[in-house]
Amino acid sequence: VPDGGWFAYAPLSEQPYSSNQGMEFWSIGLMLAAVSSAVAGLNFVVTIVNLRAPGMTLMRMPVSVWMFFVVQILLAFAIPVIAVGLIELTMDRLFGTLFFVTSAGGDPVLWQHLFWIFGHPEVYILILPPMGIISDVLPAFAKKPLFGYPFIVFSGIAIGLMGWAVWSHHMFTVGLGPIAVSVFTITTMLIAVPTGVKIFNWIGTLWGGSIEYKSAMLFAVGFIAMFIIGGLSGVSHAVAPSDYQQQDTYYIIAHLHYVLFGGAILGIFSGIYFWFPKVTGKLLSEKLGKLHFWITFVGLNLTFFPMHYLGMNGMPRRIYTYATEFGWDNLNALSSFGYIVLFVSMLIFVYNIIKSYKSGEEAGHDPWDAPGLEWTITSPPPVYNFSELPVVEGRDPYWIVKRRAVAEGKEIPGPQPLVDPSTVHLPDPSYWPIFTSVALLILAIGFMIEIPVWFVKYPISVVGGLLVFVGVLAWSNEPPTKEKDH
């Protein structure tokens, strides 16, 4: 088990303080995950750039796709930064280098810079996709187009770019100096601007709409409310003098969880309730869904809101016990009770998923009267998705088709008819990705196992490295289709 925390601050993650192998598993495991994220990110970017439907210009793409696109580009630049830090930490632990050892001329603050240069864009990597999801959900249940589409798209891009300029507000207490503190104070305030643009455009989408408060819509609206709380507490970090009081306290825990649970998790739940019918052909129970939402809403506020007060009363993060004289008992008990409430809400969600998948109401191809292309095919979709490539005439393409049919007095088109899958060209499967994954695992095992005999330990890594080379070479030279398909 890694005993340096998820942040692995040096020098606590170095050998003298974390002598078991947990940190090796942590650092090498993260490097493997980084390779996975990089490959998946390239796949998303290439697909979005090259394989859009006819008429699907960039400014007609769903906002969710836009946000996924921005996130993959962020990952492409963020992963190398944390990879450098992980490689240096691994070399310190396995080969005796001294990147983060102060007594030998290393600098533990260097780890904090590398970690947070990656870590703060990572926050936006986590929150931008749910922002895209609710930007697709809100119009469907407000029955009107997304207000300010270009502003929502470009504010998402701005958040991604500005996310690189705020990392050191996590480090105001390490002695950066007044100029650096002033710069990061300003950038931390400025990033609230594109975030506010999104919120006001979401509110504009709801304004005057014929709103249906289905479960997906409740989670989307809950996302907005909780993210506002998390965003406001985040802007307070920009005030360096008060941040000295907040730094590394439960106030930071409260802020982070209002953003990542009240924001990202509620947004993901909204997407699940919205697209589950498309994926499975079954509707989730609205009664259970609304119960799930309200218990989650109560539970997350009971869990995380008291942490603001605990932090401002001096309770530091990363502790497992405290003296009763501090007076933190009651709020911690309330927070723990809130966690139990959250746990109950998750049980309701899991039960809803299982029950609805087995015996839920048939969804049909378009249960929400939604505007997106995915609702023009059957639920669940066939393996080939679209039997014919749709031609996109504008944003909200299915609404355009449906409203034109109504205006002309015609029947609203149903889902695309099913065809024999053998008549549709599909990409061929490849075994090289799994081969490369296993090879990377062998390479990692060679570094992590505790065998004092070097001629047993290191050849495992060498073999793994050679297999990785073979896998990547074969994978990159594999044709996209079999020879018979050309």
Residue spans of the language-model regions?
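Membrane-embedded and interfacial regions of multi-pass energy-transducing membrane proteins
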Residues: 1-486
